[in-house]
Structures are given as structure tokens and as C-alpha cells.
Amino acid sequence: MTNRFLILFSVTIVSVLSSAAQIPITFKNNWMYVDASFSYGDKSFPISAMIDTGCTYCVIDSTFAVDSCGITPQNPDYNGYNTSRDRTRIFYTTIPILCVGGKEFTEVKCAIIDLSGKFQTNHRFIIGADILSKELWKFNLKSCILECLDKNSSLSYKSIITWDKRSALFYNGIVLKAKVNGKKAFFLFDTGSRYNQLPKEVGILPTDTIVKEFANIATPIVWKNRERVQAAQFSLSSINLPIDFLLTNESIGYLNVEFLLDRAFIIDYTKKRVLLVE
């Protein structure tokens, strides 16, 4: 009886720990958000954090950081770049502990940026590639669940997306080579990008023009008239589907998470690959 109780107790504990590591994902404007928390001083702050593979470090909104958290910015003379290569001044701080899905990350470097003033959204915190690269993360976009996997576990998957050898603008950036309407194109996998964008140099003609709002860490929100390719046939590994693209003058385009909706995938920074589970 005692042994049976211990076995049942162990199974219950494992089940609880496993479920605790699963975090619900919510979507807004093609952006993914998860619940997290961080500590600063003697206080803990719960946050809804956006997941951004196109951002090197974590980011905290400046108003929230200073007024609500009492954070003092450091390194005010650091000059940084956004994904569009616009230069901007960035302040940094170090967060003692960041908790995401039952995982604790210590001494987290964090940029302090006016997110609400530039993006006109409720972004308070962004989880960047610095944190994402430290673990194996499984994104199940069918059930909208994020899970941190054991690095030593056996991974089951159906196909692989290998990162291209081209260097991204920033450390831990993910560059993918795909085909659009049968033509080769390179993209930065940027879950923080609101739109999918295709380089004009690929040679695909636009189907129409549309007015869209744009913003980044260097510039506030503006409205732009942009050429668009509607329902372009996108192919990458085992993925084949129509996607709308805005055209860009940059040599590398942008892919947000849209091409992975209704799928489950694992981002493996160590082996530079994305594993398609479903």
C-alpha cells in the first residue's frame, strides 16, 4: 500500500510539474503573448509578454519600468539598431529574475524603450531571442500552448526547417530560405513583425497597394502606402500555403508567425533549426 501510494504521489507531482510548464498563448495582430513575471528590488511584477524572435534582448516599456517598477536606466549612451537598420539610442537595465513557464532566468539584460508611445499598443514587456535561445521551446499553435522542453529529451517531429547560413543583422537572428511563387527568397523569422514582407528584388509584381501603419523602436507610428502581393504561394520545407506579402526594398524580407498557425513547432537555437511537430 505504501509503495503504491508513493508511485501515485510521484505520478501526480510529475503531472503537476508538467502542466505548470505549459503556458497559454494569446494572439493580437499576429503577435504572441504569454504570462510571465519578473523581480526588481524586493517586488515581483506579473506581465503579459510578447514573444519576439526578431529582438536580441528583452524589452520593457519605459513608462512602466520607471513609474510602476522603479527601474533606473543604465548605459544611456548605447546606440542600437532595429531590424530595419535604423539607429536609435537605447537604455538598458538588468532584471534579477525573469520567470517564464516555470523557468527562472537570472541577470536578464533588458532594453528600456518607449513602447506605448511608438507602437500605440499595450506592450509592456517583450521576450527576446536572448531568453528564447537558452531553452527548447515548443509552440503549439493549434491549442495555443507554449511549453519549455527538457534539452535532453527525445524530440519527435515530422520535418525540419534548417536556418540559412546567411548572417542576420543581430545575434541569434533566424534567417530562412523559402520560395514565393516559385522564386527563391530570404526572410528574417520575426514574430514581432506585424506584416509579412517580401523583398522587391525577388521580382514578383504587386497585385495592389494598401495603406498600413508601421512603427519600430527607432521611429513612432506612421501610415505608409505599400505595394502588396496577395495570396502568393509560399513554400518552406513541408509547408505550402498562400500568404499576403507587403513588398520591401530590403534584401531580406520578414516572416511573422502566420505561416505556422495551426501547427506545432520547436525552435532549436543550438542546432539552428525549427522542428515541425504537426
Language-model-derived ranges and their functions:
Residues A20-E278:
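Pepsin/retropepsin-fold aspartyl endopeptidases
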Residues M1-P24:
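Bacterial Sec-dependent N-terminal signal peptides
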